[in-house]
């Protein structure tokens, strides 16, 4: 069985833990509990193959900036999350999370961009609250622009409350992992030489 280590990053309260719990257990957690560091392991069948997904949840709060990168070792891919109703979390995708990952991994670990809470994008009360701060929800097109900016291999929006695209986030991640393994194999084959 193939093991895949996925680390989920993003600002606090954007729904990272809720996304992991909803995927692993099918339940929506109602209470917000700030995460320091947690991990889940779940078995998942995808395209008739079993995967052991190591899902590593990280703290988004600034207090854990020095602790968080310790969990980045041996990561197969990163999911960077922002909330579509939290514009600062979107800005931090590049300013904080992309920069931190590149600084501490220094490698070509694939990135998946995830826009959370998209069920609230058209919610009247949410839009009014954002308007009071002279802000608006992040559009899908803005998400696509950020995907290009950080070189993410995939971009998905989801809603844990409605369940929309929760599985798709992780299926996209598995596809990206599969593609990366093929690239690595081809690269190794290319670099093999035979001396006669």
From Swiss-Prot:
A Pfam family it matches: Ras
Residue stretches in coiled coil: none
A GO biological process held by the record: mitotic cytokinesis
Keyword set includes GTP-binding: yes
Localisation: Cell membrane
Binding-site positions, GTP: 10-17, 57-61, 116-119
In-chain residues carrying the UniProt-annotated modification Cysteine methyl ester: 193
Keyword flag Nuclease: no
Major subcellular site: membrane
Cross-referenced InterPro entries: P-loop_NTPase, Small_GTP-bd, Small_GTPase, Small_GTPase_Rho
Gene3D superfamilies attached to this UniProt entry: P-loop containing nucleotide triphosphate hydrolases (3.40.50.300)
GO MF annotation list: GTP binding; GTPase activity; protein kinase binding
Membrane topology category: Lipid-anchor
Positions where lipid (S-geranylgeranyl cysteine) attaches: 193
Residue ranges of the motif Effector region: 32-40
Gene Ontology CC: cell projection; cytoplasmic vesicle; cytoskeleton; plasma membrane
Propeptide, chain numbering: 194-196
Entry keywords, A to Z: Cell membrane, GTP-binding, Lipoprotein, Membrane, Methylation, Nucleotide-binding, Prenylation
Family classification: Belongs to the small GTPase superfamily. Rho family.
Protein name, as recorded: Rho-related protein racL
Lineage of producing organism: Eukaryota, Amoebozoa, Evosea, Eumycetozoa, Dictyostelia
Gene (UniProt): racL
């Amino acid at each position: 069985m193939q093991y895949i280590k996925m680390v989920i990053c993003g600002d606090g309260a954007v729904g990272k833990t809720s996304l992991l719990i909803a995927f692993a257990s099918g339940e929506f957690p109602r209470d917000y509990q700030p995460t320091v560091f947690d991990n889940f392991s779940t078995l998942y069948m995808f395209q008739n193959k079993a995967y052991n997904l190591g899902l590593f949840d990280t703290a988004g709060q600034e207090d854990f900036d020095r602790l968080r990168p310790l969990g980045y070792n041996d990561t197969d891919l990163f999911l960077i999350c922002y909330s579509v109703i939290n514009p600062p979390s979107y800005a931090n995708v590049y300013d904080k999370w992309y920069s931190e990952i590149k600084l501490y991994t220094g490698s070509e670990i694939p990135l998946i961009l995830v826009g959370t809470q998209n069920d609230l994008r058209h919610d009247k009360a949410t839009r009014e609250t954002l308007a009071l701060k002279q802000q608006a929800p992040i559009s899908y097109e803005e998400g696509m622009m950020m995907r290009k900016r950080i070189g993410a291999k995939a971009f998905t929006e989801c809603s844990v409350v409605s369940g929309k695209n929760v599985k798709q986030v992780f299926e996209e991640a598995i596809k990206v992992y599969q593609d990366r393994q093929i690239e690595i194999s081809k690269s190794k084959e290319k670099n093999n030489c035979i001396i006669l």
